[in-house]
Design a protein with these regions (language model features):
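N-terminal secretory signal peptides that target proteins for export/translocation
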Residues: 1-26
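Residue-level detector of alpha-helix boundary/anchor positions
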Residues: 5-7, 32, 128
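N-terminal non-cleavable signal-anchor helices
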Residues: 6, 41-43
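Intrinsically disordered, low-complexity regions enriched for glutamine and histidine
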Residues: 10-12, 21, 31, 172, ...
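Juxtamembrane/membrane-water interface recognition
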Residues: 11-14, 42, 206
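Bacterial N-terminal signal peptides
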Residues: 28-41
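Carbohydrate-active catalytic/glycan-binding domains of CAZyme proteins
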Residues: 46-504
Length: 504
Protein backbone atom coordinates (compact mmCIF):
# COMPACT_ATOMS: atom_id res chain seq x y z
CA UNK A 1 0.00 0.00 0.00
CA UNK A 2 1.27 3.45 -0.93
CA UNK A 3 1.96 5.30 2.36
CA UNK A 4 0.50 8.46 0.86
CA UNK A 5 -2.82 6.77 0.03
CA UNK A 6 -5.51 6.11 2.67
CA UNK A 7 -6.73 2.52 2.91
CA UNK A 8 -10.34 1.56 2.25
CA UNK A 9 -11.04 0.85 5.93
CA UNK A 10 -9.36 4.04 7.13
CA UNK A 11 -11.61 6.06 4.85
CA UNK A 12 -14.81 4.34 5.93
CA UNK A 13 -14.26 3.39 9.58
CA UNK A 14 -16.68 5.12 11.96
CA UNK A 15 -15.34 5.69 15.47
CA UNK A 16 -17.47 4.53 18.39
CA UNK A 17 -18.27 7.10 21.07
CA UNK A 18 -16.57 5.14 23.83
CA UNK A 19 -14.37 2.05 24.01
CA UNK A 20 -15.59 1.56 27.57
CA UNK A 21 -19.24 1.59 26.48
CA UNK A 22 -18.51 -0.92 23.71
CA UNK A 23 -17.05 -3.45 26.15
CA UNK A 24 -19.04 -2.64 29.32
CA UNK A 25 -20.41 -6.19 29.55
CA UNK A 26 -16.86 -7.57 29.64
CA UNK A 27 -15.63 -5.32 32.45
CA UNK A 28 -16.01 -7.88 35.24
CA UNK A 29 -14.17 -10.53 33.20
CA UNK A 30 -11.32 -8.16 32.44
CA UNK A 31 -10.93 -7.18 36.10
CA UNK A 32 -11.17 -10.75 37.38
CA UNK A 33 -8.98 -12.23 34.65
CA UNK A 34 -6.48 -9.61 33.45
CA UNK A 35 -4.76 -12.24 31.32
CA UNK A 36 -7.82 -12.21 29.04
CA UNK A 37 -7.74 -8.48 28.35
CA UNK A 38 -5.67 -8.76 25.17
CA UNK A 39 -7.84 -11.54 23.79
CA UNK A 40 -11.14 -9.72 24.40
CA UNK A 41 -9.91 -6.39 23.06
CA UNK A 42 -8.31 -8.00 20.02
CA UNK A 43 -11.53 -9.88 19.22
CA UNK A 44 -13.66 -6.74 19.56
CA UNK A 45 -11.23 -4.74 17.46
CA UNK A 46 -11.19 -7.37 14.71
CA UNK A 47 -14.99 -7.44 14.66
CA UNK A 48 -15.13 -3.66 14.41
CA UNK A 49 -12.60 -3.68 11.55
CA UNK A 50 -14.91 -5.98 9.57
CA UNK A 51 -17.70 -3.39 9.58
CA UNK A 52 -17.61 -0.90 6.69
CA UNK A 53 -18.64 2.61 7.69
CA UNK A 54 -20.72 4.13 4.88
CA UNK A 55 -22.17 7.00 6.90
CA UNK A 56 -24.61 8.86 4.65
CA UNK A 57 -22.38 8.63 1.55
CA UNK A 58 -23.82 7.20 -1.65
CA UNK A 59 -22.48 3.72 -2.48
CA UNK A 60 -22.04 2.37 -6.00
CA UNK A 61 -21.44 -1.13 -7.37
CA UNK A 62 -18.49 -0.24 -9.60
CA UNK A 63 -16.46 -2.66 -7.47
CA UNK A 64 -17.42 -5.61 -5.30
CA UNK A 65 -16.05 -4.31 -2.01
CA UNK A 66 -19.48 -4.03 -0.33
CA UNK A 67 -20.79 -7.39 -1.52
CA UNK A 68 -20.76 -10.46 0.71
CA UNK A 69 -22.77 -12.78 -1.53
CA UNK A 70 -24.79 -12.79 -4.74
CA UNK A 71 -27.23 -15.33 -6.12
CA UNK A 72 -28.36 -15.12 -9.76
CA UNK A 73 -27.46 -11.45 -10.17
CA UNK A 74 -24.46 -9.90 -11.88
CA UNK A 75 -22.69 -6.58 -12.05
CA UNK A 76 -23.17 -4.99 -15.47
CA UNK A 77 -21.30 -2.12 -17.14
CA UNK A 78 -23.68 0.35 -18.80
CA UNK A 79 -22.91 2.63 -21.72
CA UNK A 80 -23.67 6.31 -22.31
CA UNK A 81 -25.89 7.59 -25.12
CA UNK A 82 -24.34 9.58 -27.96
CA UNK A 83 -25.77 13.11 -28.19
CA UNK A 84 -25.02 16.32 -30.09
CA UNK A 85 -21.69 17.98 -30.89
CA UNK A 86 -20.63 20.26 -28.04
CA UNK A 87 -17.54 21.87 -29.60
CA UNK A 88 -16.01 21.72 -33.06
CA UNK A 89 -13.43 23.44 -35.20
CA UNK A 90 -14.79 26.86 -36.21
CA UNK A 91 -11.89 29.32 -36.17
CA UNK A 92 -8.49 29.59 -37.78
CA UNK A 93 -6.72 28.76 -34.50
CA UNK A 94 -8.85 25.58 -34.21
CA UNK A 95 -8.38 24.46 -37.80
CA UNK A 96 -6.61 21.18 -37.08
CA UNK A 97 -8.04 20.13 -33.78
CA UNK A 98 -10.19 20.60 -30.69
CA UNK A 99 -9.29 18.08 -28.02
CA UNK A 100 -8.10 17.42 -24.46
CA UNK A 101 -10.97 19.27 -22.79
CA UNK A 102 -11.49 19.77 -19.05
CA UNK A 103 -14.90 20.92 -17.85
CA UNK A 104 -16.57 21.52 -14.50
CA UNK A 105 -19.33 23.55 -12.90
CA UNK A 106 -18.06 26.82 -11.44
CA UNK A 107 -20.75 28.76 -9.61
CA UNK A 108 -23.73 29.36 -11.88
CA UNK A 109 -21.99 28.36 -15.11
CA UNK A 110 -20.14 25.49 -16.70
CA UNK A 111 -16.60 26.18 -17.89
CA UNK A 112 -14.33 24.31 -20.32
CA UNK A 113 -10.71 24.54 -21.42
CA UNK A 114 -9.57 22.66 -24.51
CA UNK A 115 -6.58 22.27 -26.76
CA UNK A 116 -6.60 23.78 -30.24
CA UNK A 117 -4.17 23.17 -33.09
CA UNK A 118 -3.51 25.82 -35.70
CA UNK A 119 -1.42 23.47 -37.87
CA UNK A 120 -1.64 19.80 -38.74
CA UNK A 121 0.00 17.32 -36.40
CA UNK A 122 3.37 16.35 -37.82
CA UNK A 123 3.61 19.49 -39.95
CA UNK A 124 5.50 22.70 -39.25
CA UNK A 125 5.08 25.32 -38.04
CA UNK A 126 2.76 23.74 -35.46
CA UNK A 127 1.09 25.74 -32.71
CA UNK A 128 -0.90 24.05 -29.92
CA UNK A 129 -2.71 26.42 -27.57
CA UNK A 130 -5.48 26.38 -24.95
CA UNK A 131 -8.91 27.88 -25.64
CA UNK A 132 -11.89 28.53 -23.37
CA UNK A 133 -15.66 28.00 -23.62
CA UNK A 134 -18.55 28.36 -21.21
CA UNK A 135 -22.18 27.33 -20.94
CA UNK A 136 -25.29 28.03 -18.88
CA UNK A 137 -26.61 24.47 -19.14
CA UNK A 138 -23.58 22.27 -19.93
CA UNK A 139 -25.11 21.46 -23.32
CA UNK A 140 -24.91 24.60 -25.46
CA UNK A 141 -21.46 26.20 -25.44
CA UNK A 142 -20.17 29.62 -26.43
CA UNK A 143 -16.62 30.78 -27.15
CA UNK A 144 -16.24 34.30 -25.76
CA UNK A 145 -13.84 36.83 -27.25
CA UNK A 146 -11.46 37.35 -24.34
CA UNK A 147 -8.80 39.69 -25.68
CA UNK A 148 -5.97 37.87 -23.88
CA UNK A 149 -3.79 36.10 -26.47
CA UNK A 150 -2.81 37.52 -29.83
CA UNK A 151 -3.23 35.20 -32.81
CA UNK A 152 -2.32 36.36 -36.31
CA UNK A 153 -2.45 40.00 -35.27
CA UNK A 154 -5.73 39.92 -33.34
CA UNK A 155 -6.90 39.24 -29.78
CA UNK A 156 -10.50 38.68 -30.91
CA UNK A 157 -10.47 35.05 -29.85
CA UNK A 158 -11.10 32.68 -26.93
CA UNK A 159 -7.45 31.73 -26.33
CA UNK A 160 -6.11 31.73 -22.76
CA UNK A 161 -2.64 30.11 -23.05
CA UNK A 162 0.01 29.91 -25.74
CA UNK A 163 3.07 29.71 -23.53
CA UNK A 164 5.32 26.79 -22.67
CA UNK A 165 3.42 23.55 -22.73
CA UNK A 166 0.17 22.29 -24.21
CA UNK A 167 -2.59 19.88 -23.13
CA UNK A 168 -3.61 22.11 -20.21
CA UNK A 169 -5.58 20.42 -17.41
CA UNK A 170 -7.07 23.16 -15.19
CA UNK A 171 -9.05 22.79 -11.97
CA UNK A 172 -10.58 25.08 -9.39
CA UNK A 173 -8.55 24.71 -6.22
CA UNK A 174 -10.94 24.13 -3.31
CA UNK A 175 -8.07 23.74 -0.87
CA UNK A 176 -9.02 26.07 2.03
CA UNK A 177 -5.38 27.21 2.12
CA UNK A 178 -5.24 28.20 -1.56
CA UNK A 179 -4.20 31.79 -2.23
CA UNK A 180 -6.78 34.00 -3.99
CA UNK A 181 -4.42 34.63 -6.91
CA UNK A 182 -3.95 30.85 -7.27
CA UNK A 183 -7.59 29.81 -6.96
CA UNK A 184 -7.25 28.02 -10.30
CA UNK A 185 -4.37 25.70 -11.06
CA UNK A 186 -3.33 23.58 -14.01
CA UNK A 187 -0.60 21.37 -15.34
CA UNK A 188 0.71 21.51 -18.89
CA UNK A 189 3.03 19.28 -20.84
CA UNK A 190 6.04 20.49 -22.80
CA UNK A 191 8.57 17.66 -22.77
CA UNK A 192 8.27 17.73 -18.98
CA UNK A 193 5.23 18.74 -16.91
CA UNK A 194 4.87 22.29 -15.55
CA UNK A 195 2.49 23.90 -13.05
CA UNK A 196 0.38 26.98 -13.80
CA UNK A 197 -1.74 29.21 -11.53
CA UNK A 198 -4.49 31.76 -12.15
CA UNK A 199 -6.85 33.98 -10.15
CA UNK A 200 -9.76 33.51 -12.56
CA UNK A 201 -9.07 30.55 -14.87
CA UNK A 202 -8.36 32.91 -17.77
CA UNK A 203 -5.11 34.71 -16.99
CA UNK A 204 -2.39 32.13 -16.38
CA UNK A 205 1.24 32.22 -15.31
CA UNK A 206 3.87 29.63 -14.41
CA UNK A 207 3.87 28.59 -10.76
CA UNK A 208 7.56 27.68 -10.87
CA UNK A 209 10.36 28.03 -13.37
CA UNK A 210 11.28 24.35 -13.13
CA UNK A 211 9.02 21.44 -14.10
CA UNK A 212 7.20 19.45 -11.42
CA UNK A 213 7.65 16.13 -13.27
CA UNK A 214 10.63 15.14 -15.40
CA UNK A 215 10.37 11.34 -15.48
CA UNK A 216 9.21 11.11 -19.11
CA UNK A 217 7.19 10.24 -21.18
CA UNK A 218 4.28 12.67 -20.73
CA UNK A 219 2.81 12.93 -24.25
CA UNK A 220 -0.80 12.65 -23.11
CA UNK A 221 -3.46 14.62 -21.27
CA UNK A 222 -1.95 14.59 -17.79
CA UNK A 223 -4.46 15.42 -15.05
CA UNK A 224 -4.15 17.11 -11.65
CA UNK A 225 -6.70 18.19 -9.03
CA UNK A 226 -7.24 18.99 -5.37
CA UNK A 227 -8.73 15.89 -3.73
CA UNK A 228 -10.91 16.83 -0.73
CA UNK A 229 -11.08 13.19 0.38
CA UNK A 230 -7.30 12.87 0.64
CA UNK A 231 -6.75 16.56 1.47
CA UNK A 232 -3.89 16.83 -1.00
CA UNK A 233 -3.20 17.44 -4.68
CA UNK A 234 -3.23 14.39 -6.93
CA UNK A 235 -1.85 13.95 -10.45
CA UNK A 236 -2.33 11.18 -13.01
CA UNK A 237 0.17 11.21 -15.87
CA UNK A 238 1.45 9.13 -18.78
CA UNK A 239 3.76 6.25 -17.92
CA UNK A 240 5.00 2.97 -19.38
CA UNK A 241 4.09 -0.53 -18.18
CA UNK A 242 6.20 -3.57 -19.01
CA UNK A 243 4.86 -6.28 -16.67
CA UNK A 244 1.84 -8.56 -17.04
CA UNK A 245 0.18 -10.45 -19.86
CA UNK A 246 -0.34 -8.38 -23.00
CA UNK A 247 -4.02 -7.71 -23.71
CA UNK A 248 -5.97 -8.42 -26.87
CA UNK A 249 -5.16 -6.07 -29.77
CA UNK A 250 -2.02 -4.78 -28.04
CA UNK A 251 1.66 -4.92 -28.91
CA UNK A 252 4.77 -3.88 -26.99
CA UNK A 253 6.31 -1.12 -29.03
CA UNK A 254 6.50 1.88 -26.68
CA UNK A 255 9.98 1.69 -25.14
CA UNK A 256 9.51 -2.04 -24.64
CA UNK A 257 6.11 -1.70 -23.00
CA UNK A 258 2.71 -0.08 -23.37
CA UNK A 259 1.48 3.37 -22.45
CA UNK A 260 0.14 3.40 -18.91
CA UNK A 261 -0.98 5.73 -16.09
CA UNK A 262 1.03 6.93 -13.08
CA UNK A 263 0.04 8.79 -9.93
CA UNK A 264 1.74 11.27 -7.59
CA UNK A 265 0.58 13.49 -4.71
CA UNK A 266 1.54 16.87 -3.27
CA UNK A 267 0.67 19.04 -0.29
CA UNK A 268 1.60 22.35 -1.96
CA UNK A 269 1.29 21.73 -5.75
CA UNK A 270 5.01 22.46 -6.13
CA UNK A 271 6.69 19.45 -4.55
CA UNK A 272 5.44 16.03 -5.57
CA UNK A 273 5.99 12.42 -4.60
CA UNK A 274 7.61 10.05 -7.10
CA UNK A 275 5.25 8.98 -9.85
CA UNK A 276 3.93 5.47 -9.18
CA UNK A 277 2.13 3.21 -11.70
CA UNK A 278 -1.50 2.49 -10.95
CA UNK A 279 -2.27 -1.15 -10.20
CA UNK A 280 -5.01 -3.24 -11.76
CA UNK A 281 -4.35 -6.67 -10.26
CA UNK A 282 -4.06 -9.47 -12.76
CA UNK A 283 -5.98 -7.67 -15.53
CA UNK A 284 -4.30 -7.87 -18.95
CA UNK A 285 -1.75 -5.20 -19.85
CA UNK A 286 -3.48 -2.74 -22.16
CA UNK A 287 -2.36 0.55 -23.62
CA UNK A 288 -3.98 3.55 -21.91
CA UNK A 289 -3.34 6.71 -23.90
CA UNK A 290 -5.24 9.18 -21.70
CA UNK A 291 -6.88 8.73 -18.29
CA UNK A 292 -9.55 11.44 -17.54
CA UNK A 293 -9.50 10.47 -13.85
CA UNK A 294 -12.04 12.24 -11.65
CA UNK A 295 -13.41 12.11 -8.11
CA UNK A 296 -17.10 11.28 -8.59
CA UNK A 297 -18.90 14.06 -6.73
CA UNK A 298 -22.21 12.25 -6.20
CA UNK A 299 -20.36 9.42 -4.46
CA UNK A 300 -16.99 10.84 -3.34
CA UNK A 301 -15.69 7.52 -2.02
CA UNK A 302 -14.93 6.66 -5.65
CA UNK A 303 -12.42 7.76 -8.25
CA UNK A 304 -13.47 6.97 -11.82
CA UNK A 305 -11.08 6.63 -14.74
CA UNK A 306 -12.03 6.63 -18.43
CA UNK A 307 -8.79 5.87 -20.31
CA UNK A 308 -8.56 5.87 -24.06
CA UNK A 309 -7.59 2.27 -24.77
CA UNK A 310 -5.21 2.17 -27.73
CA UNK A 311 -5.32 -1.10 -29.69
CA UNK A 312 -1.97 -0.56 -31.35
CA UNK A 313 -1.92 -3.91 -33.18
CA UNK A 314 -5.14 -3.16 -35.07
CA UNK A 315 -5.14 -1.76 -38.59
CA UNK A 316 -7.04 1.52 -39.00
CA UNK A 317 -9.59 2.10 -41.74
CA UNK A 318 -8.26 1.61 -45.32
CA UNK A 319 -6.32 4.52 -46.77
CA UNK A 320 -5.38 6.08 -43.45
CA UNK A 321 -2.06 7.88 -43.96
CA UNK A 322 -1.00 8.35 -40.36
CA UNK A 323 -0.42 5.87 -37.53
CA UNK A 324 -1.58 2.35 -36.85
CA UNK A 325 -4.20 1.38 -34.27
CA UNK A 326 -7.75 2.19 -33.14
CA UNK A 327 -9.16 3.44 -29.83
CA UNK A 328 -12.11 2.91 -27.53
CA UNK A 329 -12.90 4.11 -23.99
CA UNK A 330 -12.44 1.84 -20.97
CA UNK A 331 -13.84 2.16 -17.43
CA UNK A 332 -11.99 1.72 -14.13
CA UNK A 333 -12.73 2.68 -10.52
CA UNK A 334 -10.74 3.06 -7.33
CA UNK A 335 -11.29 3.78 -3.66
CA UNK A 336 -7.68 4.51 -2.71
CA UNK A 337 -6.42 6.17 -5.90
CA UNK A 338 -3.70 3.64 -6.74
CA UNK A 339 -5.50 0.25 -6.91
CA UNK A 340 -8.06 0.34 -9.73
CA UNK A 341 -10.80 -2.22 -10.24
CA UNK A 342 -10.61 -3.70 -13.74
CA UNK A 343 -13.60 -6.02 -13.60
CA UNK A 344 -15.05 -4.64 -16.83
CA UNK A 345 -12.73 -5.31 -19.75
CA UNK A 346 -15.31 -4.47 -22.42
CA UNK A 347 -15.47 -0.94 -23.82
CA UNK A 348 -17.43 1.79 -22.06
CA UNK A 349 -17.68 3.68 -25.38
CA UNK A 350 -17.09 2.01 -28.77
CA UNK A 351 -15.99 3.84 -31.94
CA UNK A 352 -19.46 3.16 -33.35
CA UNK A 353 -20.88 3.68 -36.82
CA UNK A 354 -19.00 6.94 -37.35
CA UNK A 355 -16.13 5.81 -39.58
CA UNK A 356 -14.18 8.90 -38.57
CA UNK A 357 -13.53 7.15 -35.26
CA UNK A 358 -11.90 4.05 -36.72
CA UNK A 359 -8.32 5.29 -36.76
CA UNK A 360 -5.66 5.97 -34.15
CA UNK A 361 -6.12 8.56 -31.40
CA UNK A 362 -9.66 9.34 -32.46
CA UNK A 363 -11.65 8.58 -29.32
CA UNK A 364 -10.59 10.37 -26.11
CA UNK A 365 -12.81 10.85 -23.08
CA UNK A 366 -12.51 14.42 -21.87
CA UNK A 367 -12.17 15.11 -18.15
CA UNK A 368 -15.40 16.18 -16.48
CA UNK A 369 -18.81 14.82 -15.47
CA UNK A 370 -21.57 17.44 -15.47
CA UNK A 371 -25.04 16.95 -14.00
CA UNK A 372 -27.12 18.64 -16.68
CA UNK A 373 -30.53 17.60 -15.34
CA UNK A 374 -31.84 15.70 -12.30
CA UNK A 375 -31.87 12.52 -14.40
CA UNK A 376 -28.83 13.07 -16.63
CA UNK A 377 -25.06 13.23 -16.40
CA UNK A 378 -23.14 14.62 -19.37
CA UNK A 379 -19.74 13.35 -20.45
CA UNK A 380 -17.66 14.52 -23.39
CA UNK A 381 -15.59 12.65 -25.95
CA UNK A 382 -13.20 13.88 -28.65
CA UNK A 383 -13.81 12.20 -32.00
CA UNK A 384 -12.65 12.34 -35.64
CA UNK A 385 -9.09 13.37 -34.78
CA UNK A 386 -7.02 14.69 -37.72
CA UNK A 387 -10.18 15.15 -39.83
CA UNK A 388 -12.02 18.36 -40.80
CA UNK A 389 -14.92 16.97 -38.75
CA UNK A 390 -12.89 16.82 -35.52
CA UNK A 391 -15.29 17.45 -32.64
CA UNK A 392 -16.02 17.09 -28.95
CA UNK A 393 -19.34 15.30 -28.61
CA UNK A 394 -21.63 15.06 -25.60
CA UNK A 395 -22.77 11.71 -24.18
CA UNK A 396 -25.30 11.13 -21.41
CA UNK A 397 -25.88 8.51 -18.75
CA UNK A 398 -28.23 8.35 -15.76
CA UNK A 399 -26.79 9.57 -12.46
CA UNK A 400 -24.73 6.75 -10.87
CA UNK A 401 -25.54 4.69 -13.95
CA UNK A 402 -22.08 3.37 -14.78
CA UNK A 403 -22.57 -0.08 -13.24
CA UNK A 404 -25.60 -1.87 -11.84
CA UNK A 405 -26.39 -5.08 -10.05
CA UNK A 406 -28.80 -6.70 -12.48
CA UNK A 407 -31.32 -9.51 -12.04
CA UNK A 408 -33.17 -11.26 -14.84
CA UNK A 409 -36.76 -12.42 -15.01
CA UNK A 410 -36.21 -15.39 -12.68
CA UNK A 411 -34.83 -13.11 -9.99
CA UNK A 412 -31.86 -13.11 -7.66
CA UNK A 413 -30.42 -11.39 -4.63
CA UNK A 414 -27.45 -9.59 -3.14
CA UNK A 415 -26.27 -9.47 0.48
CA UNK A 416 -23.89 -6.77 1.65
CA UNK A 417 -21.06 -7.08 4.10
CA UNK A 418 -21.70 -5.61 7.58
CA UNK A 419 -22.18 -1.84 7.27
CA UNK A 420 -22.51 1.03 9.70
CA UNK A 421 -24.58 4.01 8.55
CA UNK A 422 -25.94 7.34 9.70
CA UNK A 423 -29.30 8.77 8.71
CA UNK A 424 -33.03 8.14 8.93
CA UNK A 425 -33.97 6.58 5.58
CA UNK A 426 -32.52 4.24 2.95
CA UNK A 427 -32.59 5.57 -0.63
CA UNK A 428 -32.15 3.55 -3.83
CA UNK A 429 -31.30 4.38 -7.44
CA UNK A 430 -33.06 1.62 -9.37
CA UNK A 431 -34.89 0.62 -12.52
CA UNK A 432 -37.34 -2.25 -13.06
CA UNK A 433 -39.45 -3.48 -15.93
CA UNK A 434 -43.26 -3.33 -15.69
CA UNK A 435 -43.22 -6.76 -14.04
CA UNK A 436 -39.90 -6.39 -12.21
CA UNK A 437 -39.50 -5.63 -8.52
CA UNK A 438 -37.31 -5.10 -5.46
CA UNK A 439 -37.67 -6.04 -1.82
CA UNK A 440 -35.20 -4.96 0.84
CA UNK A 441 -34.36 -6.63 4.14
CA UNK A 442 -32.08 -5.29 6.87
CA UNK A 443 -30.28 -7.91 8.93
CA UNK A 444 -28.02 -7.86 11.95
CA UNK A 445 -24.32 -8.57 11.57
CA UNK A 446 -24.94 -12.33 11.78
CA UNK A 447 -27.59 -12.37 9.06
CA UNK A 448 -30.74 -12.44 11.20
CA UNK A 449 -33.60 -10.29 9.83
CA UNK A 450 -34.37 -7.38 12.13
CA UNK A 451 -37.90 -6.95 13.44
CA UNK A 452 -39.93 -4.69 11.18
CA UNK A 453 -37.31 -4.78 8.41
CA UNK A 454 -37.63 -8.39 7.21
CA UNK A 455 -38.35 -9.23 3.59
CA UNK A 456 -41.98 -9.99 4.44
CA UNK A 457 -42.30 -6.47 5.89
CA UNK A 458 -41.25 -4.79 2.61
CA UNK A 459 -43.91 -4.24 -0.06
CA UNK A 460 -42.72 -4.75 -3.63
CA UNK A 461 -40.85 -1.80 -5.09
CA UNK A 462 -41.06 -1.15 -8.83
CA UNK A 463 -40.53 1.70 -11.25
CA UNK A 464 -37.55 3.82 -12.24
CA UNK A 465 -36.20 6.28 -9.66
CA UNK A 466 -32.92 8.06 -9.04
CA UNK A 467 -33.29 8.56 -5.28
CA UNK A 468 -36.33 6.88 -3.73
CA UNK A 469 -36.78 5.94 -0.07
CA UNK A 470 -37.50 2.32 0.83
CA UNK A 471 -40.65 1.74 2.89
CA UNK A 472 -41.54 -1.19 5.08
CA UNK A 473 -45.00 -1.84 6.51
CA UNK A 474 -44.16 0.26 9.57
CA UNK A 475 -42.72 3.13 7.50
CA UNK A 476 -39.34 4.26 6.19
CA UNK A 477 -37.57 5.29 9.41
CA UNK A 478 -34.38 3.26 9.97
CA UNK A 479 -32.77 5.66 12.47
CA UNK A 480 -33.07 3.07 15.26
CA UNK A 481 -30.42 1.05 13.39
CA UNK A 482 -27.99 3.92 12.77
CA UNK A 483 -24.52 3.28 14.17
CA UNK A 484 -25.11 -0.47 14.42
CA UNK A 485 -23.55 -3.19 12.29
CA UNK A 486 -26.18 -4.28 9.76
CA UNK A 487 -26.39 -6.09 6.44
CA UNK A 488 -28.72 -5.20 3.57
CA UNK A 489 -30.35 -7.91 1.49
CA UNK A 490 -31.70 -6.89 -1.91
CA UNK A 491 -34.08 -9.38 -3.56
CA UNK A 492 -34.84 -8.38 -7.14
CA UNK A 493 -36.35 -9.51 -10.43
CA UNK A 494 -35.96 -8.00 -13.92
CA UNK A 495 -34.32 -4.99 -12.32
CA UNK A 496 -31.14 -2.94 -11.96
CA UNK A 497 -29.78 -1.47 -8.73
CA UNK A 498 -27.30 1.34 -9.40
CA UNK A 499 -26.65 2.83 -5.96
CA UNK A 500 -27.91 3.21 -2.41
CA UNK A 501 -27.40 5.70 0.38
CA UNK A 502 -28.71 6.54 3.83
CA UNK A 503 -29.90 10.05 4.58
CA UNK A 504 -32.58 12.24 6.08
Amino acid sequence: MNPGVPSFNSIHRQEESSMFARHRSSLFILLAHPALILFVNASASAADESVIGVGHRRQLFVDGSLIERTDDVRRVLHHPTRREIALQSEHRWEKYGVSYMVTFRDGDRFRAWYRVDAALLGKTPRRAMTAYAESDDGIHWRKPKLGIIEFEGSKENNLVWDGRGANMAPFRDDNPQAKPDERYKAIVRARDVYALVSPDGLHWKSAEKNPIFTDRPFDSHNIAFWDPQEKQYVAYTRGVRRDGKLGRGMQSRFKGGVRWVRRATSKDFRNWTTLEPIRTGDAPREEFYTNATIRYQRAPDYLLMFPSRFATAREPKPGWEFGKGVNDIAFLSSRDGIHFDRTFLEAFIRPGLDQGNWHERSLYMERGILQTSPTELSLFCMQNWRLPTVQIRRYTIRPDGFVSVQAGYRGGELLTKPLRFSGRRLFLNYSTSAIGSFQVEIQDRDGKPLAGFALADCPEIYGDRIDAAVRWNAGDDVSSLAGKAVRIRFVMSDADLFAFRFGQ
